[in-house]
A protein has these predicted regions:
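General structural signal for secondary-structure boundaries
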Residues: 1-5, 9-10, 166-174
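A generic local structural motif
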Residues: 3-7, 24-26, 93-99, 120-122, ...
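Short aromatic-enriched loop/helix-cap "lid" or pocket-rim segments at secondary-structure transitions
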Residues: 51, 76-80, 147
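Generic structural signal of hydrophobic/aromatic residues within well-ordered alpha-helices
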Residues: 8, 50, 92, 147, ...
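SAM cofactor-binding core of SAM-dependent methyltransferases
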Residues: 2-75, 141
Length: 189
């Protein structure tokens, strides 16, 4: 079982609503555990595959998949060309638009898709205080370690880090630090 699935299995009891960047096995697991899931996916083929799989009665109505068109993508959903930059900027916000529309309160955010730094910063500012943010592959990707400038890791599961949204962290995320993160909104890693 992957680190991500293990972490979700441990932490899912604390929420009934999850924001997810990058859909897959975790989407299915969360739905089967009874969570409402707002999931965003960059690969059209994968989006079709996951939504087809989620048509069953167990998950119907609980999972809201959003296709984020960021242009042509590779097999992992990463853009192969940087010309649709406006779409890159919308990607981190798309699930939060749905959250606000549906008046939901997510207590868990799962980052396993594209633009993880941008999605982390967006989620850190949008999620309620006390919410947990899981970021897959955190330790093996040193670019992600910028997060440590304002957020404190609360748990580690293999290569996955868990962070809690705190007021102190939000206060540390000042203008200068936000500017250092601004390029992450255009970087699909």
């Amino acid at each position: 079982m992957s680190d991500l699935i293990n972490a979700i299995d441990l932490l899912v009891q604390s929420t009934d609503c999850v924001v997810e960047y990058g859909s897959g096995e975790s989407t299915v697991l969360l739905a089967e555990k009874g969570c409402t899931v707002i999931s965003v996916e960059t690969s059209w083929n994968y989006f079709l595959k996951i939504t087809e799989r989620l048509e069953g009665p167990i998950v119907k109505g609980r999972v809201h998949c959003i296709y984020a068109d960021v242009g042509t993508v590779d097999q992992w959903g990463s853009p192969v060309d940087t010309s649709p930059r406006a779409a890159f900027l919308r990607y981190p916000l798309q699930p939060w638009v749905q959250i606000e529309r549906r008046e939901l309160t997510p207590r868990l955010v799962v980052l396993d898709g594209r633009f993880r730094l941008a999605c982390f910063v967006t989620s850190f500012m949008k999620a309620p205080l006390g919410a947990l943010i899981l970021i897959n592959n955190f330790y093996s990707r040193t670019d992600y370690h910028l997060i440590n400038h304002f957020a404190q890791e609360s748990e580690r599961v293999g290569d996955l880090a868990v962070f809690e949204v705190t007021e102190k962290g939000r206060n540390m995320l000042d203008t200068d630090l936000m500017l250092s993160f601004s390029s992450s909104f255009l970087n699909p890693l």
